[in-house]
Amino acid sequence: EAVIKSIPGVTDHGNKFVCLENEKISLIPEVEFLAGTTAADYEFIWFRFPQDPQGTTYHYEQADTLAMTQNLDYQIVDSPRDYWLIYKVRNKKTGALTEQKFEFIISAVNGWIVLDEDVSGNGDIHIIRDADIVEGGDGRIVANYFSVNNGGKKMRNSRFIGLCPQQPNLYVYSDDGAYIMNASTYMERPKMSYADLFNVTLDVVNPQAANYIPRGYNTEVLVNNHIIYAIGYRAYGWSKFKDISESLKYKAAPAIVPIQIAGDNNAVLFDMENNRFLTVDKWGNLFAPISTGIFDVGAIDPSLKYVYMGEGKDGETCLIMKNETGDLSMFRVNLAMSEPVPVALLDLGHLPEISHAVHYTFGIRGNYMFYATDSKIYSWRFGGETASEFFSVGSGEKIVQMKLYSNSSDKVLNGKVLFVATQKGNEGKVYKVIFNEMSGLSSGKSQEYTGFGIIKDMYYKN
């Protein structure tokens, strides 16, 4: 009888086929028919059923037939879900049946998002389906996905990306507020504006940082024009951003550090006016803690100026400051609990090219940091005598951003991949660099993604 020799894209991928929402797919099986017969002597069925059927005994949802053709050409209209698909080839005369069963996964359009704009200032988002960080990823770039889902519309004056699974909303913050999308479909929320996110009227529209912390009681924090707003989702009736300053006077830096270990607090911010750390607890309340020890988190040397703040290992917050002559130092502190624990105060002046550093990020699985000049990235293990050259970009390229891949559900690569965005004229490029999560040293493995415009931000969406 007929023999299904292969289904390209399926049998060569471990009998699994992964496609995207709204994608048009085509599967062309290689079938060897019984001698003396042709395709006309057979009937073909593409039979699909869910891997986790919903319902109760005798009332489970039923399977469906996608097509009754030799090849499958199908427009995905379903939401993300895991199915089984069986390709059946039946001899019309003898009834003999041959079949091939495989996993049929409809995946959300997730991956490494790149926000860019062209020379005219028209912005869009592109999703890198990197094979290492996306199940079923094949390295393709799903381009212009905002305009594809919004009638060709482009974004203007975009700044950075944010995500709130609680709503669920995907945000692209801009000079004028935000583009607010359904986090699954990437379609704009109708008649919803940046102002609608707040329970107060803003004096100035100036989004500077946003972070959703899905721990404890699910807190969303936003900095607008150096003022801190939050939503404590577990508090009854609290669904919009409110100013949580109370009586505190401060000027918040454009950074929010999540705390992803158990404790009293969910986020850390920094007051540039009074040189002190601020915390947001799991209920959405703002505090200005103090401490003893190596340094007082509520009174950092007033001669120092804020440079950068980010998440470190085991819930630590790492802060870089500079003095009047430009010398850099780093403050490490654990602010997870109501009683802060200063960890270390480190001088960075001895590190190679540190005076030319323009970008920073910290390890979340090891005690090290990356810092970048315009063309080179260094890795430094805390307390080490010197830093190691980690990565250099191509000739004529300028590093414009670097971000760590952080995904707690990925036990293999979480905190082990650095994405680096570069610019050469109006052409943007993204490098993916895998490194040792304990030492911060490069594995020597890197990959390039090209075809972008002027890159404004990068963000991982699962």
Regions found by a protein language model. Give the residues of each.
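Charge-dense, extended regions
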Residues: 318-319, 418-422
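Preference for solvent-exposed, low-hydrophobicity sequence contexts
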Residues: 142-153, 159, 164-365, 379-389, ...
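Conserved blade-ending motifs and adjacent loop-strand segments that build the rim/top face
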Residues: 344-358, 387-411, 439-457
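Acidic/polar, low-complexity intrinsically disordered N-terminal segments immediately downstream
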Residues: 1-144, 410-415, 422-462
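Signature of short aromatic-glycine-proline-rich micro-motifs recurring in repeat-based ectodomains
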Residues: 155-162, 168, 210, 399-407, ...
